Amino acid sequence: MTVLCRLRHCHLSTPTLCRRFHDARVYKEDKRWPGWQVVVGIETHAQIKSRRKLFSGKITGTNPDEPPNKHVSPFDAAFPGTLPKLNSKCVDLAIRTALALKSDIQHRSSFDRKHYFYSDLPSGYQITQQYAPIALRGQLNIQMPNSSAVPVRIKQIQLEQDTAKSTLNPRKRISNIDLNRAGAGLMEIVSEPDLRSPEEAGMFVRTLQAVLRAIGASDGNMEQGSLRCDVNVSVNRVGRPPGTRCEIKNLNSVKFMMAAITHEIIRQRAILESASDLETCTVPQETRGFDENTFETYRLRSKEDAPDYRYMPDPNLGVLVLSQDRVQAIRDSLPELPWETRHRLREMYALSERDIDVLLSVDSGREVTFDGEKDVDGSGAVAMTHELLGQLSARKETFTDNSLTSDHLGELIDLVQNGTITGTSGKYLLRHMLAKPSSLRPAQITQQLRLTSLSSFSSSGHSNPTSTTDQELTTLCQAAITALPNEVAAVRAGNKNVMNKIVGRVMRESRGRADAKGVKALVEELILGGGDKS
């Protein structure tokens, strides 16, 4: 492995030095492209979870089912003489995001106009924070599998307007413009070029999504357009300066983003490897798009064709001043962050990393609480929680919206763990309680639905013939033995694999109320111990 030293060639100018030796990470070769290093930076545009737009009082119209141009103010449509009014809720959520990403809050920031002409921008400029953003110098740690945490620096966080939505009508050769989204609040979160693979880029976006959702700043749904990514990719020989970066615009899923980065690495590497002189060969600096059908990037424009945005301060918006008290109040109200949730689930409930990943991958999964003490092996709580999250996902509900309280969930888990009901019955009981909310406790519903487990052996390992459930289970086992004489003969001849057929019959007849291991032990005792009197 090779370490790139920042102090080499000290005679270089400072900008060149920063560009050339910004990488302090230890190089680890990727077998997919040996001898080459990949450098990736990401710009994410997260739609702020505010009911109102950033500079007007209109409702944020991001619901695709709503009719077009329903939530539009004169300012959103760029009527002459209209003035912006900053939404303080958007500012607070941007501060909350900056604190979660360990950024330096700028107590004085300002807004600029970014000029360009396009049909989805009525005013001809976008209000953003190019020169004095609301936050600088943050960090987000990402956890790759079988690796230590990778720190990714956040260059800046800035507030800006979203554009309108344009839809091309190819038959009429016109674009339909919907201004419902125009003026909605966005946060642009810009990372430093600290990522070294498509997988790291994907993990960065997933981790950022988890943070934004945990603090309530954004839905982070790429499929619905509330989180969009632009990536900058460059390739260089190991030990050489970073190559020319190419930007890939408007990636709307983690899968497509990783595919776009992979194709761009292969494309740039092919250009450099085909050159006769690697010292003088460079990749053309371009802005590129991504074809979701072919999984390839394509050229949009070159550096020479790039527009001059002519940034200038917005004269209608003054300096945004944030007091220490305001920032501290937001800091004090920060909820539990994903890495804190992960630590709590690991320490309090002894969950595995895989189970924690399942919980954190589902919206509101972090809100699940377990009543009582830890499981000995964690299996009971995990199985019921997986079932709960699956049912809520199918119903499109969150944990806080459903009628099942954490107290009742804890009691249900206890019923499974102490053997009162089987895991199969526990899942059935959970589905019943979600479908038919009731004030009855899980134990009462268990009796009502006759879900009590058919126990076969006590903790001492011997059956209890006086138990009603034992007698019922013994009757079911004897009935199965009587109905399957050929299988019984095979078991007595030493072929114990055939016993599974007998056990399966008992399980079906018990409707999931019997434990498979207990049934197998009881069937074996009845057959080999002479319990079959047929």
UniProtKB/Swiss-Prot annotation:
Pfam families named in the record: GatB_N (PF02934), GatB_Yqey (PF02637)
Subcellular location: Mitochondrion
Keyword Acyltransferase: no
A single MF term (Gene Ontology): glutaminyl-tRNA synthase (glutamine-hydrolyzing) activity
Highest taxon in the source lineage: Eukaryota
This protein's record includes keyword Kinase: no
Residue interval of the organelle targeting sequence: 1-28
Entry EC no(s): 6.3.5.-
Enzyme class at the top of the EC tree: ligase
Function of the protein: Allows the formation of correctly charged Gln-tRNA(Gln) through the transamidation of misacylated Glu-tRNA(Gln) in the mitochondria. The reaction takes place in the presence of glutamine and ATP through an activated gamma-phospho-Glu-tRNA(Gln).
Family to which this protein belongs: Belongs to the GatB/GatE family. GatB subfamily.
Subunit (UniProt): Subunit of the heterotrimeric GatCAB amidotransferase (AdT) complex, composed of A, B and C subunits.
Record-given protein name: Glutamyl-tRNA(Gln) amidotransferase subunit B, mitochondrial
Organism: Laccaria bicolor (strain S238N-H82 / ATCC MYA-4686) (Bicoloured deceiver)
